[in-house]
UniProtKB/Swiss-Prot annotation:
Family: Belongs to the purine/pyrimidine phosphoribosyltransferase family. Xpt subfamily.
Quaternary structure annotation from Swiss-Prot or TrEMBL: Homodimer.
Subcellular location as annotated: Cytoplasm
Reaction it catalyzes: XMP + diphosphate = xanthine + 5-phospho-alpha-D-ribose 1-diphosphate
Functional note: Converts the preformed base xanthine, a product of nucleic acid breakdown, to xanthosine 5'-monophosphate (XMP), so it can be reused for RNA or DNA synthesis.
GO biological process, one term: purine ribonucleoside salvage
Residues bound to xanthine: 20, 27, 156
Protein name as catalogued: Xanthine phosphoribosyltransferase
Organism, as annotated: Staphylococcus haemolyticus (strain JCSC1435)
Main EC class the enzyme belongs to: transferase
Annotated signal sequence range: none
GO CC terms of this entry: cytoplasm
Length: 193
């Protein structure tokens, strides 16, 4: 997705050799037009898979996931990082470690909104070590839902997330693949690395 690749190159800020800040269009301020295009691209890639639900995790996964759900015309469900007082009945839960925040959170999804009749597309903002996507996949498995793929907005290809997801048998689609953040510069896969 060329517009996303260009945005990452122009507006992405390298924090260190493993962390890329994209607060200007994805993780804090959201470029709605770009996210609409992201959602449409995921729709084009997975439209024949019978998706009934988009699954993501709060907070940064919500923007691309909600845009995809508009194109699929299905609900967007996000895993919560805290159990709300309104959730009285059953829920699925799993522990997810955030690479960027270096923090482990227990995330939950109400059993009311995910079950064996669902066909799920998982969408997330970043792929680093794969923990968030694998955690969401675990929740889908607990619900006995079918997972048809993982849609990633920005993949850090120099980390092992894709490999871990593919080893789990998951179909991974990344719209922008970062090859390196060395030298305080964003190098995308396919560029002069």
């Amino acid at each position: 997705m060329e517009s996303l690749r260009q945005k990452v190159k122009e507006d992405g800020v390298v924090i260190d050799e493993k962390i890329l800040k994209v607060d200007g269009f994805l993780n804090h301020q959201i470029d709605a037009k770009l996210m609409h295009e992201v959602g449409k691209t995921f729709y084009e890639q997975f439209k024949d898979k019978g998706v009934t639900k988009i699954l993501t995790i709060e907070a940064s996964g919500i923007a691309p996931a909600i845009m995809a759900s508009l194109h699929f015309d299905v609900p967007c469900l996000f895993a919560k990082k805290a159990k709300p007082s309104t959730l009285k009945d059953g829920f699925y839960s799993t522990d997810i470690h955030s690479f960027t925040k270096n923090k482990t959170s227990t995330v939950i999804v109400s059993e009311e909104f995910l079950n064996e009749n669902d066909t799920v597309l998982i969408i997330d903002d970043f792929l680093a070590n794969g923990d968030a996507s694998l955690g969401l996949y675990d929740i889908a498995q607990q619900a006995k839902a079918k997972t048809v793929g993982i849609g990633i907005v920005v993949e850090k290809s120099f980390q092992d997330g894709r490999q871990r997801l593919e080893e789990a048998g998951l179909n991974v689609s990344s719209l922008c693949k970062v090859a390196s953040l060395k030298g305080n510069q964003v190098t995308l896969l396919g560029e002069n690395e």
